[in-house]
Amino acid sequence: MQVRMLGRVDLRETVEAMQAFTAQRTGDTPDVLWVCEHAPHFTQGLAGHADHLLAPGDIPVVATNRGGQVTFHGPGQVVAYPLVDLRRAGYYVKEYVHRVEEAAIRTLAHFGVTGHRVAGAPGIYVRLDDPRSHALLPQRPRKADPLEPAAAVPDFTGLGKIAALGIKVSRHCTYHGVALNVDMDLEPFSRINPCGYAGLPTVDLSTIGVHTTWDEAASVLASQLAIRLAP
């Protein structure tokens, strides 16, 4: 997999470039990983609801065709876009998601942090009371949503989200990807229901005591994705 470190790039232009790359690629087009960061933007996925944008203020909102709901991108966040031909790679979408999440978990482990999955809520989470604990996270049952009694939501008690995942698959090829919070202004997350979950805490490496550079975190995540997404 080719890795391209793009630095700070325009979000809308990057989304358009991913779409164009995917539309034009052939069976011989090499897979590529774009790693970048963006100026402050909220992005809405296909499952997004306007009421999850509580008070966007002066931060632009961009509608996208990725899966998932609303999230925030900004400086100090590593955004990785794997452009992978799944048919050639030999695995399906569910396995692809697992591999991307595993790359984020291994990246956190590099910095001494234990990342966790939560059933029914894509992305990676950390324990707020002890981010370095290796104890397994019990998979708790979903709890009732008082606003939607017929629905149920994952139990995020004691957890904070540190990496968000949102993908699109077209003609067996992936785009969009994963965002890892490194050292960023987290205030904009209070203006939304992150990924559609009211009150879900969002953290970055800095707030849980890990001080590193964007470049180092980007390098580790890129390396892990290249390893995990290999055929």
UniProtKB/Swiss-Prot annotation:
Gene source species: Paracidovorax citrulli (strain AAC00-1)
The keyword Transferase appears for this protein: yes
Keyword vocabulary terms for this entry: Acyltransferase, Cytoplasm, Transferase
EC number(s) stated in the UniProt entry for this protein: 2.3.1.181
Catalytic residue positions: 195 (acyl-thioester intermediate)
InterPro entries according to UniProt: aa-tRNA-synth_II/BPL/LPL, BPL_LPL_catalytic, Octanoyltransferase, Octanoyltransferase_CS
First-tier enzyme category under EC: transferase
Cellular compartments per GO CC: cytoplasm
Stated name of the protein: Octanoyltransferase
Reaction(s) the record says it catalyses: octanoyl-[ACP] + L-lysyl-[protein] = N(6)-octanoyl-L-lysyl-[protein] + holo-[ACP] + H(+)
Limits of the BPL/LPL catalytic domain: 27-231
Recorded metabolic or biological pathway in which this protein acts: Protein modification; protein lipoylation via endogenous pathway; protein N(6)-(lipoyl)lysine from octanoyl-[acyl-carrier-protein]: step 1/2
GO MF annotations in UniProt: lipoyl(octanoyl) transferase activity
Site (Lowers pKa of active site Cys): 161
Biological processes per GO annotation: protein modification process
Main location: cytoplasm
